[in-house]
C-alpha cells in the first residue's frame, strides 16, 4: 500500500549524514520523512566516540554555520574538549571533543523529534520507486510505499555489509545491526558504478580491569573550547581525562605471528581500508622500524565502563585480540566487552554525482556519507547537509547549490569526490585545501551563514547573533584604527613595555596588533586601547583579520583569478569527441567525468592546461562560453 500522505523529501538512514540531511530539508520548509531501521540508533557513533580533529573540526564548524546539528549536539555531549595545533597558525587549528555516546545520541534524537516538517518512521528500506529515470519514492520491508519528489541515500556501511572477525564473517550493517541486502541489490540494478570498501573498529575494554595508575593522563583544555557558534562552555557536561598506553615488541610479535589468521592478509577482504586510520596489523607491517605505537584509552561516556582503545582497530581473531590488549602496560588483566572487527560494504562512485550530490543518471536521487566513499562522522554530516538542502531545493523547483573550493572545506570535499573519485575511504585534512588560510574554523560563519540564511537554513536567532558579531568586529576594528599613540605620549612607556622595539613613530591600535609580540588580549589591557570586547568570537576575528591581513588579501587575489575558470560552465550533454585538437586520452576522461565547469575539468588527472585552452577556444567559437553568477 501507499502511505496516505506524500512527502517532498525522503531520507533513508539515520546516521550522521541522514540526520543532517533530514534537519536541513525540514528547516527549509519541505515535508520530510526520515526512514531508519531503528529509531533508537539515530545519531549513533558506530566507531570512535569523538567529533572533530584536523580538517574534520573545520567541517563541523561549517555544518554549524549553515544551521546544522552536529556542533550543537557535541557541545551537549562532549566530555573532553581540546584545540589541536594550538601552537600553530589559525588555518590549521582544529577543535576535537571526546563524546559521551549516550548523551550525543540523545541530543540528536531530541533535535530530530522537535523539528517541524519532519516525520520519523522505523522500517528498513528494500526498494526505490524509479519512473523514467527519476526516483519518486521508496518501499519498506513490509511493502509500505512512500512517495516523494526527492530521495537521499545515507545508508553508511549497511549496503551488503559483511563483518569479519578473524577468518569468520557474517552479514551485518555494524555490530548488532542487520545489513541492507535487498536495497544493495536494487541499487546494483541501476546505471551506477559500484565498489567495495572496508573499515574497522577496535575491541572495547572494561575500564574496571585497567590499571590507570601506571598510565599518563591527558586532560582537556582550560578554558574549554566550544564547537557551535551559538554555544558556550556552560553547556558541556562533566569533563574527564583520557589515558595513554603503547604497543610494544611483545604486541608486535603477537600480530606478526598471527597474520595468516587476518582476513586482510589472508585475502578474505576485497575492500580497500582507510589509509589514515589503519588497523594495528597494517601499522605493524607498514612501519616495521617502529617498536611502539601510541594508544589513547578514551572513555565512551560518563555512565559507561567501556573504554575505546584508539589505535588498535583490528579484525584479527578474538583470542589474538585478547593477547594484543593484555600485552600493553596497564592492560595486563584487561577484559574485552566487545570484539574489534572489520566491515566491508558497497559504495558508489561519487564521480557519477553532480556537485549537489544528485545522481547524474537518476533525477532526484541524492547520495551522502560513506556510500560516496568517505570515512568519518564529520565528512558524512557535511555531505548530508548538502544533499538534504539540495533535495529540498529540487522538490521546490529551485536550482541546486554547492560551495566552491575557495568557500568551504565542504566545497573541497565534494569537488574532490565528484571530480577525482576515490579508491579508498576519503578523509578530510587541511592539506587538501589550497586556500586554507581563508578556510579557517574561526571564520566558518563569516563564510557561510549569510548563504545559509538565503538558502533558508539559518533561523532568526542565529541570524541575529551573526549580525551582532559582524557589528562588533567592524566597530572594534574602526576603534583600533582611529586610536593612536605617539612616542612622546604619556602612554608610550606603558606601550613600550610590551614591545620588542620601542615606538619610533605614531602608531594606531591596528599597527601595534600587527606586531608579532602583541596580542589583542595584551593590547586591550593598555590604557589607550582598553577595554577589550566582551564578545570573544568577535575579538578573535579582530586579531586574526589584522595580523594576517596581507596574506589574506594575497590569497583572495588568487581565488578571484581561479574563479574565472570555476564559473565557466560546461554543458552536461557535451560530447568531447566534437572538440577538435583534444587527445584521445583527454576526450575519454572528459566524457567519463562529465565535469560541470572548466575549473573541475582542469583538476582531472591527465587533462592538461593545453587541453583546457583548446576547450575554451572551442566553446567561444560555438557561442557556448557562459559563466555562472
UniProtKB/Swiss-Prot annotation:
Q: Which GO terms describe its molecular function?
A: flavin adenine dinucleotide binding
Query: Which positions bind NAD(+)?
Result: 273-287
Q: Which UniProt keywords apply?
A: Cytoplasm, FAD, Flavoprotein, NAD, tRNA processing
One biological-process term from Gene Ontology? Answer: tRNA methylation
Question: SUPFAM superfamilies from the entry?
Answer: FAD/NAD(P)-binding domain
Q: Which residues are involved in binding FAD?
A: 13-18, 125, 180, 370
Is the tRNA processing keyword given for this protein? yes
Compartments annotated for it: namely: Cytoplasm
User: Which cofactor is recorded for it?
Assistant: FAD
Question: Looking at the keywords, is Flavoprotein present?
Answer: yes
Q: Which SMART domains does the protein's record reference? A: GIDA_assoc_3
Please tell me one Gene Ontology term that the record gives under cellular component.
Answer: cytosol
Say which family it is in. Belongs to the MnmG family.
Q: How does it assemble?
A: Homodimer. Heterotetramer of two MnmE and two MnmG subunits.
Please identify the protein, giving its name as recorded. tRNA uridine 5-carboxymethylaminomethyl modification enzyme MnmG
Gene source species: Escherichia coli O1:K1 / APEC
The lineage is: Bacteria, Pseudomonadati, Pseudomonadota, Gammaproteobacteria, Enterobacterales
Amino acid at each position: 500500500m501507499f502511505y496516505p500522505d506524500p512527502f517532498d523529501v525522503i531520507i533513508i538512514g539515520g546516521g550522521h549524514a541522514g540526520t543532517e540531511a533530514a534537519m536541513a530539508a525540514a528547516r527549509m520548509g519541505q515535508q520530510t520523512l526520515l526512514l531508519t531501521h531503528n529509531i533508537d540508533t539515530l545519531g549513533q557513533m558506530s566507531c570512535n566516540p569523538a567529533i572533530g580533529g584536523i580538517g574534520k573540526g573545520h567541517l563541523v564548524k561549517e555544518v554549524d554555520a549553515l544551521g546544522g546539528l552536529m556542533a550543537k549536539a557535541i557541545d551537549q555531549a562532549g566530555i573532553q574538549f581540546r584545540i589541536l595545533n594550538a601552537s600553530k597558525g589559525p588555518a590549521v587549528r582544529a577543535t576535537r571533543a571526546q563524546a559521551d555516546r549516550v548523551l550525543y545520541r540523545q541530543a540528536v534524537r531530541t533535535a530530530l523529534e522537535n523539528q517541524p516538517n519532519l516525520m520519523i518512521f522505523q522500517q528498513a528500506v528494500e526498494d526505490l520507486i524509479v519512473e523514467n529515470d527519476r526516483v519518486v519514492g521508496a518501499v519498506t520491508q513490509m511493502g509500505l510505499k512512500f512517495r516523494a519528489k526527492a530521495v537521499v541515500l545515507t545508508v553508511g556501511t549497511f549496503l551488503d555489509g559483511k563483518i569479519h572477525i578473524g577468518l569468520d564473517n557474517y552479514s551485518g550493517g555494524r555490530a548488532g545491526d542487520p545489513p541492507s541486502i535487498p536495497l544493495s541489490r536494487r541499487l546494483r540494478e541501476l546505471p551506477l558504478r559500484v565498489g567495495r570498501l572496508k573499515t574497522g573498529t577496535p575491541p572495547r575494554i572494561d575500564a574496571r580491569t585497567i590499571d590507570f595508575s601506571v598510565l599518563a593522563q591527558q586532560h582537556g583544555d582550560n578554558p574549554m573550547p566550544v564547537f557551535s557558534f551559538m554555544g558556550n562552555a556552560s553547556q558541556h557536561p562533566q569533563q574527564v581525562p583520557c589515558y595513554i598506553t603503547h604497543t610494544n615488541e611483545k604486541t608486535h610479535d603477537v600480530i606478526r605471528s598471527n597474520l595468516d589468521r587476518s582476513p586482510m592478509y589472508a585475502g578474505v577482504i576485497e575492500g580497500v581500508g582507510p589509509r589514515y586510520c589503519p588497523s594495528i596489523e597494517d601499522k605493524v607491517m607498514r612501519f616495521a622500524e617502529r617498536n611502539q605505537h601510541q594508544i589513547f584509552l578514551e572513555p565512551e561516556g560518563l555512565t559507561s565502563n567501556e573504554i575505546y582503545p584508539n589505535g588498535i582497530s583490528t579484525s584479527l581473531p578474538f583470542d589474538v585480540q585478547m593477547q594484543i590488549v593484555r600485552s600493553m602496560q596497564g592492560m595486563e588483566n584487561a577484559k574485552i566487552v566487545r570484539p574489534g572487527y572489520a566491515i566491508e560494504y558497497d559504495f558508489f562512485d561519487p564521480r557519477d554525482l553532480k556537485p549537489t550530490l544528485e545522481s547524474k543518471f537518476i533525477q532526484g536521487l541524492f547520495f551522502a556519507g560513506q556510500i560516496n566513499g568517505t570515512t568519518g562522522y564529520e565528512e558524512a554530516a557535511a555531505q548530508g547537509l548538502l544533499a538534504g538542502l539540495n533535495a529540498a531545493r529540487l522538490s521546490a523547483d529551485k536550482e541546486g547549490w554547492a560551495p566552491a573550493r575557495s568557500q568551504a572545506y565542504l566545497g573541497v570535499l565534494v569537488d574532490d569526490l565528484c571530480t577525482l573519485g576515490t579508491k579508498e575511504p576519503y578523509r578530510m585534512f587541511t592539506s587538501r585545501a589550497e586556500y586554507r588560510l581563508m578556510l579557517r574554523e574561526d571564520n566558518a560563519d563569516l563564510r557561510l551563514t549569510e548563504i545559509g540564511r538565503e538558502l533558508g537554513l539559518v533561523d532568526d536567532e542565529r541570524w541575529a547573533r551573526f549580525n551582532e558579531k559582524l557589528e562588533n568586529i567592524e566597530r572594534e576594528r574602526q576603534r583600533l584604527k582611529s586610536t593612536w599613540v605617539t612616542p612622546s605620549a604619556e602612554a608610550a612607556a606603558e606601550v613600550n613595555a610590551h614591545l620588542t622595539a620601542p615606538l619610533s613613530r605614531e602608531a594606531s591600535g591596528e599597527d601595534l596588533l600587527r606586531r608579532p609580540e602583541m596580542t589583542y588580549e595584551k593590547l586591550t589591557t593598555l590604557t589607550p586601547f582598553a577595554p577589550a570586547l566582551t564578545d570573544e568570537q568577535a575579538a578573535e576575528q579582530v586579531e586574526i583579520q589584522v595580523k594576517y591581513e596581507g596574506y589574506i588579501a594575497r590569497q583572495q587575489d588568487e581565488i578571484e583569478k581561479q574563479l574565472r575558470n570555476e564559473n565557466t560552465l560546461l554543458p552536461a550533454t557535451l560530447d568531447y569527441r566534437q572538440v577538435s585538437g583534444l587527445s584521445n586520452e583527454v576526450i575519454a576522461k572528459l566524457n567519463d567525468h562529465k565535469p560541470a565547469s572548466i575549473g573541475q575539468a582542469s583538476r582531472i588527472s591527465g587533462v592538461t592546461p593545453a587541453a583546457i585552452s583548446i576547450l575554451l577556444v572551442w566553446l567561444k567559437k560555438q557561442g557556448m562560453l557562459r559563466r555562472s553568477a
